[in-house]
Amino acid sequence: MDSPAFFFTIFLWCLLLSITGYSIYVGFGPPSQQLRDPFEEHED
């Protein structure tokens, strides 16, 4: 448990988990109302 690789792995796992959680929050949570949809803006 004193290995630096163990703590580095835990750090990377937490970083990846937090980035994923934030992306889901921005994509589907309350901030998603401010996102624009380029397909809706494009007129054929």
UniProtKB/Swiss-Prot annotation:
**What keywords are assigned to this protein?**
Chloroplast, Membrane, Plastid, Thylakoid, Transmembrane, Transmembrane helix
Cellular component (GO) terms are: chloroplast thylakoid membrane
Highest taxon of source: Eukaryota
Q: How does it sit in the membrane?
A: Single-pass membrane protein
**Membrane-crossing residue ranges in chain numbering:** 6-26
Q: Which InterPro entries match?
A: PSII_PsbN (IPR003398)
Q: Name one GO biological process term.
A: photosynthesis
Question: Where can this protein be found?
Answer: Plastid, Chloroplast thylakoid membrane
Q: Which HAMAP family match?
A: PSII_PsbN (MF_00293)
The UniProt entry, under PANTHER family, shows:
PROTEIN PSBN
Q: What does this protein do?
A: May play a role in photosystem I and II biogenesis.
Name the family the entry cites.
Belongs to the PsbN family.
Q: What is this protein called?
A: Protein PsbN
